[in-house]
Design a protein with these regions (language model features):
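Extracytoplasmic beta-strand/coil segments of soluble accessory domains associated
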Residues: 55, 84-124, 128
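Transmembrane beta-barrel wall of Gram-negative outer-membrane proteins
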Residues: 184-213, 218-257, 280-297, 407
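Face-selective signature of the C-terminal outer-membrane beta-barrel domain
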Residues: 240-250, 282-425, 446-448, 497, ...
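Membrane-embedded beta-barrel scaffold of Gram-negative outer-membrane proteins
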Residues: 301-317, 448, 454-460, 483-566, ...
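Gram-negative outer-membrane beta-barrel transporters
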Residues: 343, 404-408, 416, 507-511, ...
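C-terminal beta-signal and adjacent terminal beta-strands/loops
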Residues: 606-613, 632-684
Length: 684
């Protein structure tokens, strides 16, 4: 059974005990036993509290949920841009064809050297081997029902890539609807999205198709992509189980405009370099999964998923005029399964209790090739690697409520890594590092002593291991490496002092025992040891809805990073900041229903500068503040039109990195200038 619920911002939790007195006097809002914050409308499948696996919002302490209604009309070219609305999320806009950008949080950057966020699509693991998130591009806004963002180290359900947290993108399941969205705008951007839902007594069907093309803000930046998916789920008359199949396919081809010198970027931001004329990328991805949820008894529920992911990526790129063009090819096949068993017995001496155990595995078959090229013609091969990378994990977690206002969630997870590596250029085979059994204890507590506030705290351990060749014992390295252990904790307060206000304030910290960083431009595929690191920061969020016509939001994140004990290869990085981590991230906005048919909105987002490398000697770049406007007019019950103006002030902003090999200077990728997009949404 599908139930559409409108959830006002259920803010996030706890804070130092100093703040306790601020909320003790106000009993206006309903008590909240979770620390999750929800924005927008989310589809609830059945009785998510009383049955099935433990929900993300009820178990974990740092959760943000974005509803589909605030996502479906956002003017974005890639889904990672949707996370502008999520608090504390850093967006890294490469703007290089198929390598368009990515998300990160908790003081980790989006460079691709340390990929600290696990991506799931409808609960299916969707990172590539290196931890990047190309599968996110498969999802378009109109297909989404919600996005869950879990920040921190307390989630025991996932192991690999779950260093700083995870993101789960849920698409529409069930419902009777026909939706279409057409969009046209600056840089000859053209987009079509079609979504269809069919719900019968036992079967639900969901279909989606999207096509987008654009010339891009910069020269030599054309992109063309399409995505399609189907979901088929069956539930018998007695509702004892639900069985489903999900299939997705995505293809794209895009030109790369390349990186510019600082002078060219500021004076001619839309230009490209002559040597980038043949740079481009192609990408093809597939995802197939089977889902089963069943009630074995009144107190026992079982959930299982099995899946197959394929990733086919080819890219030609040249970073500087004196550097060679490279062809980078990646072919990955992933298959795996996840399962959980949830027991909800009646324990007379507890207010509530649930126990959940789960296990998962993923097996990867990967090929990584690189060539030195000229105008995409191969001159020499520089990499030919084939490697298996397999992970096996299990966890146990309990939800214990001694009384109504206190929830305690202890958890424990273990992971094991296996695999093998072959260098096809030499014919030599290598074993994977024996990381041992990676043990990860966790504990979360939520205390709600008043109806207007919840205090929360959590502590947890996650891990990082090498990716690509760095996961294997390849000479001169012949001894096993230990995983980098990440210990993190957080405390905060979630508050609702009135019916029209809610928010969250939190402090967090995370330390890594031996962080490793991928060498992105090295044909060997190896990594560098960054060393012992610490990250910490504050998060704040406030949501206001003073009347039925007005919504306002404000989020702010302060984050800091430091290298405590560097590796011997870069001793001058001791005490320095990790690169590409801005200290401040913020976004704010207002939505106003001017008339029953007309909605007006304005929003801004920004960040401060960051260092380009770990010794912090090459200056700081990347800060910006962008202003945006929007208007939506409902012509009829089934037709609405909208107009979106991005970067209202035509502000220059950029992504920058330091090239130590070719330019030996900062290279720049300018962001889009002022842009206008118009859209028509049909809802039948």
């Amino acid at each position: 059974m599908l139930l559409r619920t409108k959830r006002r911002a259920l803010p996030r939790p706890s804070w130092p005990l100093l703040c306790v007195g601020l909320f003790a006097f106000n009993p206006l809002a309903d008590a909240s036993e979770t620390s999750a914050l929800t924005l927008g409308t989310v589809t609830v499948q059945g009785d998510s509290v009383a049955s099935g696996p433990l929900s993300t919002s009820s178990v974990l302490s740092s959760v943000d949920i974005l509803g589909g209604d605030i996502l479906e009309k956002m003017p974005v070219n890639y889904s990672w841009e949707l996370f502008n609305r999520a608090p504390g999320v850093l967006l890294t806009p490469f703007n290089q064809g198929t390598t368009s950008g990515k998300i990160s949080f908790r003081g980790f950057n989006g460079e691709g050297e340390v990929n600290a966020v696990k991506l799931l699509i409808d609960g299916i693991p969707s990172n590539s081997n290196d931890g990047n998130m190309p599968f996110m591009d498969m999802i378009f806004p109109l297909e989404l029902d919600s996005i869950e963002v879990v920040r921190g180290t307390s989630d025991a359900r996932y192991g690999l890539n779950n260093i700083a947290g995870n993101v789960n993108m849920f698409t529409r399941t069930g419902g009777d609807y026909t939706k279409a969205r057409l969009r046209y705008g600056s840089y000859n951007t053209q987009e079509t999205q079609l979504a269809k839902g069919i719900e019968g007594s036992n079967w639900t069907q969901n279909y989606f198709f999207a096509y987008q093309k654009t010339d891009g803000f910069r020269d030599h930046a054309q992109a063309d992509k399409f995505s399609l998916s189907g979901k088929w789920f069956y539930t018998p008359d007695d509702d004892r189980y639900r069985l489903g199949l999900i299939a997705r396919h995505y293809e794209t081809e895009a030109q790369e405009p390349g990186y510019l010198s600082e002078q060219d970027a500021h004076h001619h931001p839309s230009m490209t370099n002559p040597y980038n004329a043949s740079d481009k990328g192609t990408r093809r991805m597939n995802q197939l999964s089977v889902h089963l949820d069943t009630e074995l008894s009144e107190t026992l529920a079982w959930s299982a998923k099995t899946y197959l992911n394929t990733f086919d990526d080819r890219r030609w790129t040249q970073y500087w005029r004196t550097s060679p063009q490279q062809e980078r090819d990646a072919y990955e096949t992933q298959y795996g399964a996840l399962t959980s068993l949830t027991w909800r017995p009646d324990v007379s001496w507890l207010y509530d209790f649930a126990l959940e155990g789960g296990s998962d595995f993923q097996q990867q078959r990967n090929t990584s090739e690189r060539y030195r090229t000229r105008d995409r013609a191969r001159l020499a091969q520089t990499r030919d690697q084939q490697f298996d990378f397999d992970t096996y994990g299990a966890y146990l977690q309990a939800e214990i409520k001694p009384f109504e206002s206190l929830k305690i969630i202890p958890a424990y997870r273990v992971d094991k890594i296996r695999g093998s590596f072959t260098n096809e250029m030499t014919g030599l085979d290598y074993a994977i590092n024996d990381y041992g059994l990676i043990k990860q204890p966790k504990l979360s507590v939520v205390y709600s002593p008043w109806s207007v506030a919840s205090l929360y705290a959590n502590w947890g351990r996650t891990f990082q291991v090498g990716t690509g060749a760095a996961a294997y014992k390849i000479p001169p390295r012949d001894s096993d490496l230990a995983p980098s252990i990440n210990d993190g904790w957080e405390t905060g307060i979630k508050f609702t002092p009135t019916a029209w206000m809610d928010g969250r304030i939190a402090y967090w910290q995370q330390e890594a025992s031996g962080e490793v960083s991928r060498r992105l431009n090295d044909p060997s595929g190896e990594s560098d040891n960054v060393g012992e690191t610490r990250r910490w920061g504050y998060d704040a969020q406030l949501n206001l809805h003073p009347n039925d016509r007005t919504e306002m939001w404000l989020t702010y994140a302060w984050q800091y990073s430091k290298i405590l004990k560097p590796s011997a290869t870069l001793p001058n990085s001791k005490g320095r900041e990790i690169d590409h981590v801005p200290h401040h991230l913020y976004n704010a906005g207002v939505s106003y229903q001017a008339t029953p048919a007309l909605q007006l909105s304005a929003w801004m987002n920004g960040q401060t500068h960051y260092y380009l490398e770990r010794e912090n000697t090459q200056g700081t770049y990347g800060g910006y503040v962008l202003m945006n406007l929007g208007a939506t007019y409902r012509v009829s019950e089934s037709v609405s039109v909208d107009l979106q103006l991005k970067n209202l002030t035509n502000r220059y902003y950029e992504y920058a990195w330091y090239d130590p090999d070719g330019a030996r200077a900062a290279l720049h990728s300018p962001g889009d200038g002022r842009a206008v997009y118009s859209g028509v949404t049909l809802d039948f």
